[in-house]
Amino acid sequence: MECVMKYKRILLKLSGEGLSNKKKSLLIDYEIVKNIAIQLQKIHKQGYEVAIVVGGGNFWRGESASKNGIPRTRADYIGMLATTMNALALQSGFESVGLKARVQSSLSIDGKVAENYITEKAKHYLSNGEIVIFAGGTGRPFFTTDTAATLVASEMQCDVLLMAKNGVNGVYDADPKVSPSAIKFDSLSYDELLHIVLTNGLKIMDSTSVTMAKENNIKILVFDIQEKDSILKVLEGNAEHTKVE
């Protein structure tokens, strides 16, 4: 298959909000988790090595909290703990379909909950067919989980970063949810994406994460996680997406 020839080790970036279901008032919808698990089960059988970075926005938004009297640094640390909760939920979902999964945290945390992030150990797990879920963001405030994703992808020497979005199937010149006439890009250079991020105010990725991806030559596929089997399809080139390289 084309996707197998192109990529071996992938980094999947999941937002915390993408795990929630507002209609059902669920912070974590286990049907969504199970759907992701089933897709990864198929991907795993094809020989992919899968690393995951997950956000925590379904539980906590550090930026908004800082406006309500909580110092930004503390708010960000609370957000890092939120990513750990999501990582543990994903781990359980993956194990329920027979996948081996580890959680590594960039924050020092009790070993009964998660392992501390050690680069070589994480690479060893990936090489042995285990899924590694990275929690805690970068472990430092003022950095987004998008930046954590490009950082981990760089350290893990991933071939591609799959940037999962909620209800948006790629990069547009404007917010397609607001502007129906927004134009979608099939492909972009890193510099073009950086220009869009800085000038259009679109929350595709933050500028730090784009710059890091460029410096480490990490390809990015931006796609809609809500589309059925979208993780499988985007790797096969059969899902709407934007490729950045």
Swiss-Prot record:
Inhibited by UTP. UMP binds at G56, D76, T138, G139, R140, P141, F142, F143, T144, T145. GO terms for biological process: 'de novo' CTP biosynthetic process; UDP biosynthetic process. It comes from the Bacteria. InterPro entries: AceGlu_kinase-like_sf, Asp/Glu/Uridylate_kinase, Uridylate_kinase, Uridylate_kinase_bac. Its main location: cytoplasm. This is Uridylate kinase. It comes from Mycoplasma mobile (strain ATCC 43663 / 163K / NCTC 11711) (Mesomycoplasma mobile).
